[in-house]
């Protein structure tokens, strides 16, 4: 809804709600896509919530690696839940509206979870570096207080950045149109309907996005560089395989997540095309949160064994 307010005989349109156009406007695709994304979201919730519960209940998973994995699942569950329910509504209603304040709220929470995940992934890489390169000091370096610092600092920092960017964005003026050709609340599609000059805001977003991505990615790359050197120096083939296998799941997630974000957020505005942005956004906002727990569980014997123990001991399910 747009309200027209008159100031000194000048009509100014005040946007009070937005219309999210969704992934597609093809009527024939609405029902199939609703079913597909509903299944994806349910698998995401079950997988990530299950990982959180499993790493909490099973004492053998009370290690730094699974501590970080629990928080990775929390962030995955967080930003997918911010997006998916509202997106699913868009498939079954004629006009999917979202209020001005609720758009800002969803955007803020989405940014909190996304930025937090970047630094949790880098903390997981550092954890693998310490485990492989400094095994005798692992318990000392990765003490419980250190673990909490490595997750609380990203949560606090991401909250600050999210609030700063959201407040900065919503202080600007919007044009008459309130239609956003996107399927979730993000800052890039919203900037297309701003009346104000967006150069400063684009620069701020580019700086924050670039610094967050490159700083966290540099931690990952440096950690894996040392890990690779340590693995190549191992005499035992079995030892090299075991060391690499402990990193393979995390490395797979890192490549998918960082690759997509670098593709989306470090492009200049002129290079963005709506169709490609939507496809890339679907991948990292909906598919990656679904795939992460599957990657960590299917390729991890400890997780599979813990699941068997939990189902057998707590729920009396014979396996």
UniProtKB/Swiss-Prot annotation:
Functional note: Odorant receptor.
Subcellular location as annotated: Cell membrane
GO cellular component: plasma membrane
Extracellular membrane side: 1-31, 82-105, 167-203, 265-277
Keywords: Cell membrane, G-protein coupled receptor, Glycoprotein, Membrane, Olfaction, Receptor, Sensory transduction, Transducer, Transmembrane, Transmembrane helix
Species whose genome carries this gene: Homo sapiens (Human)
Topology of this chain in the membrane: Multi-pass membrane protein
CDD domains: 7tmA_OR8K-like
Glycan attachment residues as annotated in the record: 8
UniProt keyword annotation of Membrane present: yes
TM regions (residue ranges): 32-52, 61-81, 106-126, 146-166, 204-223, 244-264, 278-298
Location, primary (coarse class): membrane
Gene Ontology MF: a single term: G protein-coupled receptor activity
Keyword Glycoprotein listed: yes
The protein's name in its UniProt record: Olfactory receptor 8K1
Residue ranges that the UniProt entry lists as topological domain Cytoplasmic: 53-60, 127-145, 224-243, 299-319
InterPro entries named among the record's database cross-references: GPCR_Rhodpsn, GPCR_Rhodpsn_7TM, Olfact_rcpt
Protein family (similarity comment): Belongs to the G-protein coupled receptor 1 family.
PROSITE patterns referenced in this protein's UniProt entry, alphabetically: G_PROTEIN_RECEP_F1_1 (PS00237), G_PROTEIN_RECEP_F1_2 (PS50262)
